[in-house]
């Protein structure tokens, strides 16, 4: 996703179509005024803007908001909070394409609001946040720490130049979804790194990450999700079992669970498959 395009979903008055509201923002190197919504009928309206493409596509910052009317107090936020950590599956890669469409690296195919985690959060009426990086792993098997989620989550933003650190006490989720391990397995199959005891290393590093999350969020339930990505060389049954064993290694009071999905038709799931 190096084309530098940024897409957002602009929802007006509670609209729920995150496919139709997918909007490209013009790329700018300096602040520029952008019109998000116009020609609304006179009266009170609620406008929500969600970033749909991940940080490696492009970052954007809101400096101020203006209106030709006036701002009222925002609606109350949902009580239930769900947070997700993941790779391209959580970032929404490929979700903007239809079944049968060829998958590309264009950011225009990515919509994080159409992933299963985002859809489930809306079904449950929950506030949703995601920390997702395409190509990300849960384990570090060589000297490179690039795209290793446990070494990135303390950043406010995944980009290497992000200087702000994230305050985990500022927003405590009730449920944490973790969908990682796919790129670990794919990378190992493609010999992108060497590991003599890969399965055991993967299991140990995944468990270590969950232990860290339980330290940060001791009262949160954690759900390990797996099996979504369709890759011919991946033994889904074997690795779904491995991820289940990670969850089962925690005592019942820790509230760590595992859920395996059916693989997509090809590669990353489309928006109809995630729904």
Predicted regions and their residues:
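Generic structural signal for well-ordered alpha-helices
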Residues: 206-211, 240-244
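N-terminal secretory targeting modules
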Residues: 1-85, 90-109
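Conserved SGNH/GDSL esterase-like catalytic core that processes O-acyl groups on lipids
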Residues: 102-203, 231-240, 265-268, 272
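Structural recognition of the beta-strand scaffold that forms the well-ordered cores
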Residues: 81-85, 90, 128-132, 174-179, ...
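N-terminal cationic-hydrophobic initiation segments that often serve targeting/anchoring roles
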Residues: 121, 213-215, 248-251
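Short, conserved loop/helix-junction motifs that constitute active-site signature segments
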Residues: 77, 171, 215-217
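Extended, compositionally biased non-globular segments
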Residues: 197-202, 208-221
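Extracellular serine-dependent O-acyl
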Residues: 220-228, 235-275
């Amino acid at each position: 996703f190096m084309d530098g395009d940024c897409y957002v979903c602009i929802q007006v008055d509670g609209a729920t179509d995150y496919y139709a509201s997918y909007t490209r923002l013009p790329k700018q190197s300096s602040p520029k005024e952008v019109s998000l919504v116009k020609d609304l009928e006179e009266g009170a309206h609620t406008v929500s803007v969600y970033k749909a493409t991940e940080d490696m596509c492009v970052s954007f910052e809101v400096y101020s908001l203006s209106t030709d009317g006036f701002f009222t107090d925002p609606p109350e936020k949902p009580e239930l909070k769900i947070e997700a950590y993941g790779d391209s599956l959580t970032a929404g890669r490929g979700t903007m394409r239809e079944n049968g469409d060829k998958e590309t690296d264009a950011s225009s195919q990515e919509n994080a609001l159409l992933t299963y985690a985002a859809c489930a959060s809306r079904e449950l009426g929950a506030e949703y946040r995601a920390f997702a990086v395409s190509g990300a792993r849960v384990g570090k098997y060589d000297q490179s720490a690039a795209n290793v989620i446990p070494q990135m989550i303390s950043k406010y933003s995944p980009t290497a130049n992000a200087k702000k650190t994230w305050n985990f006490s500022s927003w405590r989720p009730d449920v944490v979804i973790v969908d990682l391990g796919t790129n670990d397995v794919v990378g190992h199959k493609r010999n992108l790194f060497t590991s003599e005891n890969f399965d055991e290393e993967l299991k140990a590093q995944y468990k270590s990450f969950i232990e860290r999350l339980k330290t940060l969020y001791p009262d949160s339930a954690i759900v390990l999700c797996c099996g979504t990505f369709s890759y011919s060389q991946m033994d889904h049954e074997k690795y779904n079992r491995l991820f289940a064993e990670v969850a089962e290694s925690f005592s019942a009071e820790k509230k760590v669970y595992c859920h395996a999905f059916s693989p997509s038709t090809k590669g990353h799931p489309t928006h109809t498959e995630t729904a």
